[in-house]
Amino acid sequence: MFSRRNLVALGLAATVSAGPCDIYEAGDTPCVAAHSTTRALYSSFSGALYQLQRGSDDTTTTISPLTAGGVADASAQDTFCANTTCLITIIYDQSGNGNHLTQAPPGGFDGPDVDGYDNLASAIGAPVTLNGQKAYGVFMSPGTGYRNNEATGTATGDEPEGMYAVLDGTHYNDACCFDYGNAETSSTDTGAGHMEAIYLGNSTTWGYGAGDGPWIMVDMENNLFSGADEGYNSGDPSISYSFVTAAVKGGADKWAIRGGNAASGSLSTYYSGARPDYSGYNPMSKEGAIILGIGGDNSNGAQGTFYEGVMTSGYPSDDVENSVQENIVAAKYVSGSLVSGPSFTSGEVVSLRVTTPGYTTRYIAHTDTTVNTQVVDDDSSTTLKEEASWTVVTGLANSQCFSFESVDTPGSYIRHYNFELLLNANDGTKQFHEDATFCPQAPLNGEGTSLRSWSYPTRYFRHYDNVLYAASNGGVQTFDSKTSFNNDVSFEIETAFAS
């Protein structure tokens, strides 16, 4: 129970000027790690929120709040990243403990980047506004992960802790494991009870809840728990708001899952009670590393979007968490625009011309299922003109963006598969829709448009050896070469050869 002094302090901390970590501090459960690319989580914080690295010259810079306690300076990012690409290389810890999150190393599973590291996130995949001010979240595709295996002050063993994260309830999958929280220091699976992390997704391999998901669950290692029992727990609802508050806490023989809409309303308790009655979970053996977007053993097949989150020392009360939720709602998260520069109109038919010098007579076309570039002009055959013409439709996975249907093969769309662009029939699956959705942005070379993958925002339409790929600006694939990248990912939008 709170003393009168702490109740008064909590009431003061819940004012608009306070941040989530001020509220936890007033509740005697201070933040030991605080991460956000969108805003300061303390009213007095004015330091760096995150670090960017741009693709043009690999220079880095840091992004801070516009004012102490305020929203991130998105304009500084936009200026730094103009006409190139940017990755988020560090998410800084605001607590003062130095628990920064950096590119996750290999562990039980290798990542897809150099030397088995996980990928870094695009800086522009999750635009939002907070109280009308632009900011960017962390859109994490499969293979993306951040970690700190040498964290300070985080709970170990059976010590009590709490945590929350603001996540996107529309961006998820059923792979392991989109987590934020406490994990192993070795990046390997060291056994049941060695983790305590928030999970959001629709995996049913271990635990699951009511409906089709996604669900907030707790990753305690070797199991995702949605309640007291392994497997199904009806008290854990599907939660698919654009902005989800997920709150988890654990102590000696107790733990809880709470959640709600981060844009309105209060938190609900989905489970609060004793630890799971299975070997390894009571007492717990937490190790104190911090992960984001991955499992404790570096399982990296999951996807999701992270906006802010903290970890605390001590088991926060429901009252404290309720006040934090009020603060989050007061931040007024709203989804931002995924589109910039010249755009498209759903229903129009276009041809897309290469702008790379020496290749400007070539257009995006297809030969059977292979998407490529071919020389096309008014004297070309009707067949080739149709193969180089595309009907623009509203994005199959996101209505802000677009999908491209073949004129000569109705019902088939450009999609990425293993980062090659293919023409495949729409099979109606969530995976296909995500693979076939692309967001136009201001062209990186100033000509036409650049088309960014919605599901892998580090990757763009790129012609390479006359074949189309979803390519990044530098990377492990041959077609990720930085040479001529800006030209190769920029295409002029022209009247279609055929309709």
From Swiss-Prot:
Annotated GO molecular function terms are: alpha-L-arabinofuranosidase activity
Catalytic activity as recorded in UniProt? Hydrolysis of terminal non-reducing alpha-L-arabinofuranoside residues in alpha-L-arabinosides
What remark about domains does the record contain? Organized into two domains: an N-terminal catalytic domain and a C-terminal arabinose-binding domain (ABD).
The primary site where this protein sits is: secreted
Q: What is the lineage of its organism?
A: Eukaryota, Fungi, Dikarya, Ascomycota, Pezizomycotina
Q: State where the protein is found.
A: Secreted
Provide the leader sequence positions: 1-18
Q: GO terms for CC?
A: extracellular region
Keyword Translocase applies? no
PANTHER family found in the cross-reference section = ALPHA-L-ARABINOFURANOSIDASE B (PTHR39447:SF2)
Ranges for region ABD: 336-499
Q: Which Pfam families match?
A: AbfB, ArabFuran-catal
Q: Which residues are glycosylated?
A: 83, 202
Q: Which InterPro entries match?
A: A-L-arabinofuranosidase_B_cat, ABFB, AbfB_ABD, AbfB_ABD_sf, ConA-like_dom_sf
Show the stretches that span the lipid bilayer: none
The name under which this protein is listed is Probable alpha-L-arabinofuranosidase B
* UniProt family annotation: Belongs to the glycosyl hydrolase 54 family.
